[in-house]
Amino acid sequence: AVMGRNLALNIESRGYTVSVFNRSREKTEEVIAENPGKKLVPHYTVKEFVESLETPRRILLMVKAGAGTDSAIDSLKPYLNKGDIIIDGGNTFFQDTIRRNRELSAEGFNFIGTGVSGGEEGALKGPSIMPGGQKEAYELVAPILEQIAARAEDGEPCVAYIGADGAGHYVKMVHNGIEYGDMQLIAEAYALLKGGLALSNEELATTFTKWNEGELSSYLIDITKDIFTKKDEEGKYLVDVILDEAANKGTGKWTSQSSLDLGEPLSLITESVFARYISSLKDQRVAASKVLTGPKAQPAGDKAEFVEKVRRALYLGKIVSYAQGFSQLRAASNEYNWDLNYGEIAKIFRAGCIIRAQFLQKITDAYEQNAGIANLLLAPYFKQIADEYQQALRDVVAYAVQNGIPVPTFSAAIAYYDSYRSAVLPANLIQAQRDYFGAHTYKRT
């Protein structure tokens, strides 16, 4: 409800009159009462709401993904004309969007499945928007979407037509998977700095402030530096009294499931999903901590040197995560005939969304230099960083393993990097085993 309200207010602020409807009369009245003088027109029946709109109608749905979306669409259909446009801005599974697009197209309606990132504040002030569906329908709503979207530093709106049917929601799903990876990498950097150097919260804030001034500059690093110094009403550091169980809404899981369907090695992001799952086993972990043995973390040596190693490991880990995510976008584009523009996708992530970061411009540059590049690690800039930073990533992972600090995504990053640069892997033995017990055959070198 808050996302819908804030998007309505964002659209209204650009000079539009916006018809609003909610199943709950109270919620509709509440939005109007809280925003006096705004060009928001309340409606209390679906029929009245639909008939208030100019044709072709442009209806933005912001409802909980799943059955609720189908129910909302079904309630609208009796009052729609051919050519009307429904925009689903929810966190919808892309296969549902493909189905709805197919069904509504058959009835003469347009359907645009649209990823919206930026949370409640982004919805109000300018989100990153990822629309997919009929191109001609997108052209009719593009002027509004371009006005309400976030603006990158160069003034470009963070919205672009992504591709047919479920493409927009797929890109949003991968965005969310990358977000999981970014957050887990940062959490592991925090664990290393705390475990290896016993940095105080103030020192952590200072470190992250410095990091945010360089190549790691991003929304997530920016908010993390603030989190470290936030205190609760008792004067305790808030981060230290928050239970170490990370929840999830399932979008990271969808990204990993899709990687398995496509045969894509999305190892880092998948480890970040599993890290949340193992965090939720709090009671088991507490019990296991009293039974299972392992090393106690020893000091990591020179402070400045170790902080720099962790910074480098974090940046290279982030690059590996994005390389995997964009590789999966390429596989999905081929599978679903979307013809995705990867440089354009990186561009619309530059502002408004949770993963916004300075280095996204480097991804856009890489695809502009070579649109057909198989993997971002092969692009000149990222190859140079990998050359310079891979040793730091190795050192950090080795330290973590020797000292019993779990770093699943840092470990996944170096394992993927080494696997990807290996001309020969031991998979020949696996294939021989498969042939031995199952006559699966094999290819000779």
Swiss-Prot record:
It comes from the Bacteria. Pathway: Carbohydrate degradation; pentose phosphate pathway; D-ribulose 5-phosphate from D-glucose 6-phosphate (oxidative stage): step 3/3. Catalyzes the oxidative decarboxylation of 6-phosphogluconate to ribulose 5-phosphate and CO(2), with concomitant reduction of NADP to NADPH. It comes from Raoultella planticola (Klebsiella planticola). Belongs to the 6-phosphogluconate dehydrogenase family. GO terms for biological process: D-gluconate metabolic process; organic acid catabolic process; pentose-phosphate shunt. NADP(+) binds at residues 1-4, 22-24, 63-65, 91. Its EC number is 1.1.1.44. The active site is at residues 172, 179. It catalyses: 6-phospho-D-gluconate + NADP(+) = D-ribulose 5-phosphate + CO2 + NADPH. Keywords: Gluconate utilization, NADP, Oxidoreductase, Pentose shunt. Transmembrane segments: none annotated. This is 6-phosphogluconate dehydrogenase, decarboxylating. Substrate binds at residues 91, 117-119, 175-176, 180, 249, 276, 434, 440. Homodimer. GO terms for molecular function: NADP binding; phosphogluconate dehydrogenase (decarboxylating) activity. Gene3D superfamilies: 6-Phosphogluconate Dehydrogenase, domain 3, N-(1-d-carboxylethyl)-l-norvaline Dehydrogenase, domain 2, NAD(P)-binding Rossmann-like Domain. InterPro entries: 6-PGluconate_DH-like_C_sf (IPR008927), 6PGD_dom2 (IPR013328), 6PGDH_C (IPR006114), 6PGDH_Gnd/GntZ (IPR006113), 6PGDH_NADP-bd (IPR006115), 6PGdom_BS (IPR006184), NAD(P)-bd_dom_sf (IPR036291), Pgluconate_DH (IPR006183).
